[in-house]
Structures are given as C-alpha cells and as structure tokens.
C-alpha cells in the first residue's frame, strides 16, 4: 500500500526532474555559438599566464559558457569538441581571449567570419601560404550558415565549405583511392534548390561519375561527354554551363582521335562533327569570353584534323 509519505517523495522527485530539465533546456537556449577568426591557445583559466591546454584553430565551433576579465582584457570560457571533424568527440573547456572570438550576436558577424574564410582560402592558394589554411577556410565557411542561418551569405558559405571539402577529398582520392563523400554537396542542393550554389554543387558531383583512366578506349570519353552535355542542358544558367559544354566537346575531339587510331573513320568523323556542334553552342549561347575563345580554338583543331588526345598521336594512326 502506498503511503502519503511515499506519494509525497515521488511527487518531489518528479518536480526535481522537471526543474532540472527546464534548467538544461534554458541553458541550451542561452548558450551562445561562437568561433575564432585567428588561432589562439585554450587556457585553463582566464589570463595570459595561465596553463595552455590546446591550440584552437580558426573557424572552430565554440559554445560560450562564461565571461570574465583578466589582465585588463575580456576573456570567455568556452566548450568545444576536441576533434572538430568527428561526429562524436570528447568535449574540452577552457578560456580564450574574447577579442578573437566572434559570436552570433557580434555586429556583422556573418561578414567577418565569411571574410576570414575568403582570406584563408586565398592563403591556401598562394605558394608558401599558411599551413592548414584550406581547412581553416572550410571551418569558417561552415560556421556562417550554422551561426547565421538567415544571413544572405549562408547559402554561399555552405557551398564553399562543401566545395573545399570536395576538392580536398579529390586530392585524397588520387593518392589513396578513398571514395569521396557526397553528403555535404547534396545538402547544398537540398537546402538551396534552384540556386547558383546548387548548380555548382551538382557540377562537382559529376566528378564521382568520371573514369580514373581512359586507357585509350572510347567507352569513358563517350560516357563523360554525355554527362557534361546533359548537365549543360539541364543547368543552362549555371556558372559552369560553358565549362561543361567545353568538356563535352573536348571529349568528342578525343574520341575523334581514338576512333582514327583504331581505323574507324566513320565514328571518327561523327565524333568530329559532334565536337564542332557542341563547341558552336558555347559560341552562340554562352557569355564567358574565355570559354568562347577556347571553343574557337577547339573548332579550328577539329576542322583542320589536328590531334588533341595525346601529344604523340600522328596522322597515320600510329604512335611515335
């Protein structure tokens, strides 16, 4: 039989549970997202002379826990995942100088973080640029849609982060053969359909359908030419439309040489005409002058029967 005392204890415990859940929920709601725009050492306490725990890189995902003053400067206590790339990682807490921290409430915070992403991306492209700058740019761009989902820069930040991740994966694929993860590019397409960023993401995804090597056979360039042509026709307003048409035309030019080497003149002539037609679409439909000039060059080579596939190809169909 349940006594009144027992009922009271149960009600008291239930009230405690509800209160705890409310406190946790309130803390989660108040926890402020933040990131760094320069690398800093995480300290065990506020102050320049405190013990250093770990180096925190640009663009790391942070949660503000507390604020304080030390050495006449503002400091923030933060929580962060030790491994920023892992889905599950040990959390570490410590103190950072507040001057390098940008939060979701920082005025123009989205532009500041995005701008540091652009700077890091440029560093990655420069000879002798900062080590790890590409990963910095990836993290910084990722923070923009996470911290400022309503920002005009959110879609572009998501796309640039996904593209950098993809380019790094391509380098790793060439070295190790590790498959490239499509998830982040597909998120761009899902969250910003019909946008410029979605069209660029769709173009990147074509990489996973290309052959690692042609081995002088017609199958791969035939398939790849069709892929690029289909993309150009499905995404006529894409910034990559002209490039896609050129890639389709160039592969037809390569097929012209492959079939000629195999003494299949009818297929060689058909590929030549197809290549010319695709290149002419660039001249008539696209505005990018660089791709127009490249199309003109390719048409000239096709009309003059100048080989484009392999520098050692000669007109007899033999190799030097």
Where are these regions (language model features)?
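Short coil/turn linking the two alpha-helices of tandem helical-hairpin repeats
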Residues: 83, 117-131, 162-174, 206-218, ...
